[in-house]
């Protein structure tokens, strides 16, 4: 479902993600998603969820969570297990079907909405936590979405993002080049090698196509990453205290432990609270 008020870029991104996250992609999602694939990143996420939930629970007996871009439920489940009430939103029917199965034990505290993110913000609704896990990099204008999310938070509400690529031109050189090398080492074995190479060379010239699904699904991954500093600046100006957690993640199993040991940082999480 695509909002009539979207720009061409936003329409392209929503349509690309809706088409990409089909049943086939859902079945292999864990194999290509580092935050789901690796126990170390699942543990990191679990620790952050514990922190976010503990703060929310101080101010609400049953904290309410709006999970934007909820996907197949890996990020949703820990909040339900902690005792929160969750509204899970996504554009992919296949992903939400998997979420429904994964989180079925908590149906009494789970509401699922098959809408795009813009349709998730309903008049009169407020939440103790807005969660966006592996989501911001899919959205062309993620700053506006976060601004809208901040407006529906309760007085002691929190914004919590996880698993988005650090803006590439803010990375130190060793991290930047290590990140590029390990990505292309993994990508070379994923099929359509020459098509991928052609798209990479085109993007290096600053050329992106509105009708190319590969340019729009992982929107900011194939551009310059997500600007973590701009997000913190915007939220701080609205009275939030922000904590940024930087860490390493990659699809390639051989490189994940190496990057972590070397202290490479290419991915971030933000917890912002009033």
Language-model regions, residue ranges each:
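Conserved class I S-adenosyl-L-methionine
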Residues: 1-71, 78, 160-199
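A conserved beta-strand element that flanks and buttresses the S-adenosyl-L-methionine
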Residues: 131
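Core SAM-dependent methyltransferase catalytic element
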Residues: 238, 255-274
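Short alpha-helix
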Residues: 222-239, 245
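Class I SAM-dependent methyltransferase SAM/SAH-binding core
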Residues: 72-119
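A short glycine-rich, Lys/Arg-flanked "PGG" loop and its adjoining helix->strand segment in the class I
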Residues: 143-155
């Amino acid at each position: 479902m695509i909002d009539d008020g979207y720009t061409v870029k936003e329409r392209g991104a929503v349509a690309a993600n809706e088409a990409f996250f089909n049943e086939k992609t859902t079945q292999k999602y864990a194999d290509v998603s580092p935050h789901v694939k690796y126990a170390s990143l699942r543990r990191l996420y679990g620790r952050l969820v514990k922190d976010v939930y503990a703060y929310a629970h101080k101010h609400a007996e049953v904290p309410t969570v709006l999970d934007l871009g909820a996907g197949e439920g890996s990020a949703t489940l820990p909040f339900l297990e902690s005792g929160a009430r969750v509204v899970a939103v996504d554009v992919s029917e296949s992903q939400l079907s998997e979420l429904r199965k994964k989180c079925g034990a908590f149906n009494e505290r789970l509401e699922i909405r098959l809408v795009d993110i813009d349709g998730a913000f309903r008049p009169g609704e407020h939440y103790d936590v807005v969660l966006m896990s592996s989501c911001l990099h899919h959205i062309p204008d993620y700053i506006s979405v976060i601004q809208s999310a901040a407006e529906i938070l309760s007085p002691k509400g929190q914004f919590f993002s996880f698993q988005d690529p650090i803006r590439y031109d803010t990375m130190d050189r060793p991290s930047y080049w290590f990140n590029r090398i390990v990505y292309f080492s993994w990508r070379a074995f994923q099929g359509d090698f020459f098509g991928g190479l052609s798209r990479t060379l085109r993007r290096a010239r600053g050329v992106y196509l509105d009708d190319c699904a590969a340019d729009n699904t992982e929107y900011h991954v194939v551009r310059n990453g997500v600007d973590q500093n701009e997000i913190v600046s915007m939220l701080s100006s609205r009275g939030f205290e922000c904590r940024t957690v930087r860490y390493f993640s990659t699809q390639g199993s051989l490189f994940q432990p190496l990057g972590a040991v070397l202290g490479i940082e290419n991915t971030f999480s933000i917890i912002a609270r009033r």
